[in-house]
Design a protein with these regions (language model features):
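Metal-dependent enolase-superfamily TIM-barrel catalytic cores that perform enediolate-based chemistry
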Residues: 179-308
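Bacterial N-terminal signal peptides that target proteins for export
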Residues: 2-14
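Bacterial N-terminal signal peptides
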Residues: 12-23
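A cross-domain feature marking catalytic cores of carbohydrate-active enzymes
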Residues: 75, 184-186, 221-223, 269-273, ...
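Metal- or metallocofactor-binding catalytic centers and their adjacent structured scaffolds
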Residues: 64-170
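Short, Gly/Pro- and small/polar-rich lid/capping loops
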Residues: 29, 33-59
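Shared catalytic-loop signature of beta/alpha-barrel
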Residues: 91, 285, 291-294, 302-422, ...
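Glycine-rich, aromatic-flanked loop segments that form ligand/cofactor-binding clefts
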Residues: 151-194, 214
Length: 449
């Protein structure tokens, strides 16, 4: 009887241990399956009742984790019909071509960005995506110069890169000051009844004066739109040289802008990478005469060598790099002395990490850097944080900067600026002013009973 009782006790003890072991396995599995930091939802937010062109074009990406944490990034619509824009965004969110750091076989610079591996945003944590490495392919002796490849090319798509990174950095808890000088970018034309026309000198004065009164100490004038239409109507195709008549129109606008800017503001002229060597020279001479601080991007990357030779004809400072996708391109531009200021586009070059690396390259070469961000306040702040306090940074350029200073705008707390320098540490949108549309969602599998 005693033996049987002991046996029963042992059996019961074993059963209890087994149940406990199974329960612990179930708990461990449940814990493993529960990933509170995993991104499961991507939404697109648009302003319900836009009061300006900036607000009507603003798009905000919201990434949400299983725990309910959210991260935000923004960009501007890029001309696609709404359904195509949403489909494009969903595809890019689900396959984010994160940059990697690979040894560049052509130069000693190790930061050349390789492509080839896509990384999924949904189903991963922000930390995993931001730190993902691209796949090594031993024996492959070539890295694509196109940067992120064809899926990232096309009007406006590069803006999505910095937008997604801004949202991921927000989720990852990226904080800190964004102390950089701001430079709003404005066009020299305006739209009327569906067509674009050049501004009048008086209109240009008013626009620059308004920015000056808002506290900005630099302004960037974009030469595109109406000017390109004029050249096309003349049967010209890039690279071209503006005829004297068109140069005269530009000259009047530069003179008006400089008069309004006075000595308190720098005036920057941004060409559209569409000029020939003669075209660049003639425009540079006009800029010199109007005491323009910097002429940006007069020629495309494919004319890098020609630009290096042609700039010997004038002393106007040149910025370069608006269409560069790789650090190698900047290194070659520096080697050929094609300019004194590196002007990387945050989207084209690959986002925050590569903007920082470009600034490092400028510092090593004893040059300066003036990045361009084609996004709203969230993307602007993400880039500003990465460059805060660096002496080689002249300014950070983006459109509609004055809109983000307004008290009644789409931000809960508007951006703050002192003496033309951004002093805001954080930026939060007012979600009550936005409408939300679900773009992508990961299916969460329920536990089997």
């Amino acid at each position: 009887m005693t033996s049987r009782k002991k046996l029963a006790d042992y059996v019961m003890m074993g059963f209890v241990l087994m149940v406990g072991f199974v329960a612990s396995l179930g708990f461990a599995k449940a814990k493993a399956d529960s990933k509170p930091d995993e991104i499961v939802v991507a939404d697109l937010l648009t302003v319900k009742e836009p009061k300006s062109e900036a607000e009507s074009r603003l798009r905000v990406i919201r990434l949400t984790t299983q725990s309910g944490a959210t991260g935000y990034g923004d960009y501007f619509e890029f001309g696609l019909p709404a359904e195509n824009e949403e489909a494009t965004l969903a595809r890019l969110v689900n396959r984010y071509a994160a940059q990697g750091y690979k040894q560049n076989i052509f130069l000693t610079d190790p930061s050349m960005r390789a492509v080839g591996s896509g990384h999924t945003v949904l189903g991963q944590t922000a930390k995993d995506v931001l730190n993902a490495k691209t796949r090594e392919w031993p024996g492959r002796a070539m890295y694509h110069r196109e940067g992120f490849g064809s899926m990232w090319q096309g009007t406006g798509k590069s803006g999505l890169i910095i937008s997604l990174q801004a949202a991921l950095l927000d989720l990852a808890g990226e904080t800190g000051p964004g102390k950089v000088r701001l430079c709003p970018s404005i066009r020299i034309d305006r739209e009327e009844e569906g067509t674009r026309r050049l501004c009048t000198p008086e209109e240009m004065k008013q626009r620059v004066t308004s920015l000056k009164q808002a506290g900005f100490t630099a302004v960037r004038l974009e030469l595109a739109g109406a000017l390109d239409q004029q050249m096309k109507s003349r049967g010209e195709c890039p690279p071209y040289r503006y005829p004297q008549e068109v140069l005269g129109q530009i000259d009047k606008l530069l003179s008006a802008a400089k008069e309004a800017a006075g000595v308190e503001m720098d005036v920057i002229v941004a060409a559209h990478r569409n000029l020939s060597t003669d075209g660049m020279t003639y425009l540079a001479l006009r800029c010199e005469r109007n005491e323009v601080t910097l002429l940006e991007n007069p020629m495309a990357l494919r004319h890098l060598s020609e630009q290096g030779e042609a700039r010997k004809e004038f002393s106007q400072p040149l910025g370069f790099g608006g269409d560069y996708h790789a650090i190698e391109d900047f290194a070659q531009g520096i080697k050929k002395h094609i300019g004194t200021v590196l002007v990387p586009d945050a989207g084209y070059i690959g986002g925050v990490s590569m903007i920082t690396r470009t600034a490092d390259l400028a510092k090593e070469a004893k040059l300066q850097v003036a990045p361009v961000v084609r996004g709203g306040p969230l993307s602007l702040l993400a880039v500003a944080r990465s460059l805060s306090g660096r002496g080689e940074v002249l300014w950070v350029t983006s459109p509609y900067q004055d809109e983000w200073l307004k008290e009644d705008g789409v931000l809960k707390n508007p951006l703050k600026m002192t003496d033309g320098v951004l002093v805001t540490d954080s930026c939060e949108i007012d979600e009550t002013k936005f409408q939300v549309k679900r773009i992508a969602q990961e299916e969460i599998k329920s536990a089997k009973k």
